[in-house]
Amino acid sequence: MKEISNIKVKIESGTKYTTDHGFHAVKDGIRNKKENSVHIRKPEWLKVKKQDSKEYLKVKSITKKHRLSTVCEEAKCPNINECWSHGTATIMLMGAVCTRACKFCSVDTGNPKGWLDKEEPQNTAESVKLMNLEYVVLTSVDRDDLVDGGAGHYAATITAIKNLDENIKVEALTPDFAGVKENVDKIINTKVDVIAQNIETVERLTHPVRDPRAGYWQTLEFLRYVKQKSPNILTKTSIMVGLGETDEEIYKTMDDARSVGVDIITLGQYMQPTKHHLSVERFVTPQQFEEYRRVGLEKGFLEVASGPMVRSSYRADRVFKRNNLDL
């Protein structure tokens, strides 16, 4: 077992280690297993150029100084260079270790045993100010080890940002908080502008793709509750494609999302983060992503962001501006 200290030690994917806070975690969220035998060559449209601009380095410096995690880094997002070079980042709250282990996700998995950085809400707000953000996306790991799933901590962070500047728009990509409505209310009762929760995949593939504690209809019921409780809050969800689903199943998932009042949906290509994760079953063409967007808009979504490189928070501020949603 390896231990993280002040000297940076490379931890191999799939191995167990001890964090700075004394609890154990698994690197990249999936234990070592036999490498998936299916490998599909990545098409040209998915190849990204690295660009370490001054703005990129500024974002990296600010998040490091304030001890913040970003989903950009932890989930190995392919858009990190583009987003950071434009001065935007998706801040991941409550640490970099998740209590769940979805088979597509490279965030480390473990039991933080109640650990939280009490200074994180204020540190996050200060980072947002330093980055001059007008629109900020917050997300977090799942924290099933906490009584309220971390909802109170999450809400405190939103409030700290709004107290800093009430004109800053906040999108909260939250856990499901185990479906406990009192915990969801803590987020709703802030001045949050958008609440998102990702359905990730079609109903048939939910069990093999997501952690057993997550659920297709659990996510949809969460989004239904938010819209019923506070109709003025925009709701959003996201689908990964390339995991073995059919286009018909994607359209059915769109219908299910619309049935609970979801306003915005994003669709992007799943890319295997390590050899231990689910393999890619197909690469969807840019033309097919354009078709998903056309169909989604016909189904009544206010906006559909659809493309090979699209992720839930990708260009989130621009998504809304295109439809003049006053965000």
UniProtKB/Swiss-Prot annotation:
Keywords: 4Fe-4S, Cytoplasm, Iron, Iron-sulfur, Metal-binding, S-adenosyl-L-methionine, Transferase. InterPro entries: Aldolase_TIM, Elp3/MiaA/NifB-like_rSAM, LIAS_N, Lipoyl_synth, rSAM. Gene3D superfamilies: Aldolase class I (3.20.20.70). Its main location: cytoplasm. [4Fe-4S] cluster 2 binds at C98, C102, C105. Its EC number is 2.8.1.8. PANTHER family: LIPOYL SYNTHASE (PTHR10949), LIPOYL SYNTHASE, MITOCHONDRIAL (PTHR10949:SF0). This is Lipoyl synthase. It comes from Francisella philomiragia subsp. philomiragia (strain ATCC 25017 / CCUG 19701 / FSC 153 / O#319-036).
